[in-house]
Amino acid sequence: MKLTRRHALKLVGASGLALSLPTLGRAQEIEKKNLTIAVGGKALIYYLPLSIAEINGYFDDEGLKVKVADFAGGSKALQAGVGGSADVVSGAFEHTINLQAKGQMYRAFVQQGRAPAIVLAVSNKTMADYKSPADLKGKKIGVTAPGSSTNMMVNFYLEQNGLKPSDVAFIGVGAGAGAVTAMRTGQIDAMANLDPVIGTLLKENEVRVIADTRTVADTKTIFGGNMPSACLYASEEFITKNPNTAQALANAIVRADKWIQANDAETIAKTVPATYLLGDVELYKQCLDANKESLSPNGLVDADGPATALNALAAFVPNLDASKIDISKIYTNEFAENADKKYPNV
């Protein structure tokens, strides 16, 4: 059940954000037209709405000039946002929780994903005899970057199965061809990554999947509820000073969300850059079909999503006191609701 406007206003009212939100249907002056969005792994299906918004000209339609800065992982993109080299981050929802725990107020304002779409797989070369999670102890596990959402998923999985993050060695391998090479050459024994990286390795029977969050059902099994994933987030200061800019960004992403749901894998594969395909268009289309459910249909955060994300994060982040996190301040659905009304169809 999505939040109503009244409920959303209640949630964000304490911060004063609601007072600055754009009014639907009235022309609004864009406060900041030139923007940099940081992302960790732009070619990933996880961030497909960002690419579609850029390729289809949705940012341009909103009067924005957007530069996308691509980094090796979500934690690097986060650093760019906090450091000031990017205005907005296209990253994992749970980063807003981590930031609040450190006294930095950031808010997700439009969703690209409604399930993490992260797959944990073991090597059929170095872990051919894998039988249970206990076999991961002492192994090298590849993640897109230390501290990223892939790292978080592995930590949570380890905790669920009686292991600690310190029981394994994490190695950053990125989210592209380098990750595939790391697995094939034996640099790592297991990997938490996304498609098309995972799909590439599965095609050649090089890995075996042991945990999968590409579907809503599997995500609920692993995390205990809906787990919001890719989003656009920015500092509270940025959103408060630039509400019309935030609305324009949300409009573009919601249009992209809906376009993806309305088009088949063939059309999407022809739309994205050839480099996204990792040399195999048929594989990419298979990955699109496997991940489509994980992508948001409307840019909204599910009602139980923030609490699920907080519980997952609190399970392994040292010294993170969930009772001190105000989840009403880590997201707002107001911009996405406005965008959904402005663009009810593709």
Regions of interest found by a model, annotated:
Residues 7-27:
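N-terminal export signals
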Residues 28-175, 189-195, 206, 210-213:
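Short, glycine-/small- and polar/acidic-enriched structural segments
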Residues 57, 79, 83, 97, ...:
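Solvent-exposed, polar/charged alpha-helical surfaces in well-ordered, non-transmembrane soluble domains
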Residues 61, 128, 132, 215-225, ...:
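Short, solvent-exposed loop/beta-turn-alpha elements that line the ligand-binding surface or hinge
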Residues 178-181, 185-273:
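Pocket-lining segment of extracytoplasmic ligand-binding domains
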Residues 239-320:
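Secondary-structure end/capping motifs
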Residues 310-346:
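Conserved C-terminal helix/tail region of periplasmic/extracytoplasmic solute-binding proteins
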